[in-house]
Amino acid sequence: MTPADPVETATLAASVTPPLTKRGEAKAARRREMLDAAARQMAARGFAGVRLEDIGGAVGVSGPAMYRHFASKTDLLDQMLLDISRRLRDGGAEVVDRGLPPAETLEALIHFHIDVLVTKPDLIVVQDRDLHNLTPEANHEVRSLQRRYVEQWVDVLLALMTERGATLAQPEARVRVHAMFGLLNSSPRLPALDSARLRTVLTAMATAALECAAG
């Protein structure tokens, strides 16, 4: 039996995130509750129309207690939009890393984004509308995360067009991806539609926007 490499063992041990304690789990769950409540209220009333006290009241937390979790309303917004931006970037990377053919990868990216959109519409609304209310540092990081997410799509779209023998310049691929996000991300502000039908419609729209034949 080959003895374990101590360096490799130490590296693996360091890479494993220790499990949360029950107290840590409860704190993380409460934080998610607060962020979800904040997203709902900010999507409905705008960043300026919501106070930390309003958010706390929605989850049974007093105004002063909110400051144990967030330094300010802007700090809460920073964390909210950093969270969703990382989720999109990481989810897109996971799809790309599956190593599927370009057409299947693009389809999986579309389904992934629509799933986030349908299950977390308030976050998408706030992300789309309130970037200017972030601190400069958070704004810079969110935009960097968004650019990396966009480039994941651009790379897959270019690979698909190449596979099909079509010519598509990178700037146009980027325009198509941004336009597609504009279509999808506006849907939470449109009249309500059955979830299954909404997914079908958005998938068709996204595919058409990305693969359109522009002469």
What residues fall within each predicted segment?
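Short secondary-structure transition hinges
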Residues: 118-151, 189
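Helical hydrophobic small-molecule/effector-binding pocket
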Residues: 107-128, 177
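Hydrophobic/aromatic residues within well-ordered alpha-helical segments
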Residues: 30, 73, 80, 84, ...
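Amphipathic C-terminal alpha-helical segment
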Residues: 3, 115-119, 155, 159, ...
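Amphipathic alpha-helical packing segments from all-alpha helical-bundle domains
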Residues: 86-89, 137-163, 174-178, 200
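Amphipathic alpha-helical linker/stalk segments
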Residues: 80-107
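N-terminal intrinsically disordered/low-complexity leader segments
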Residues: 1-29, 40, 164-167, 215
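Helix-turn-helix
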Residues: 33, 37-75, 79
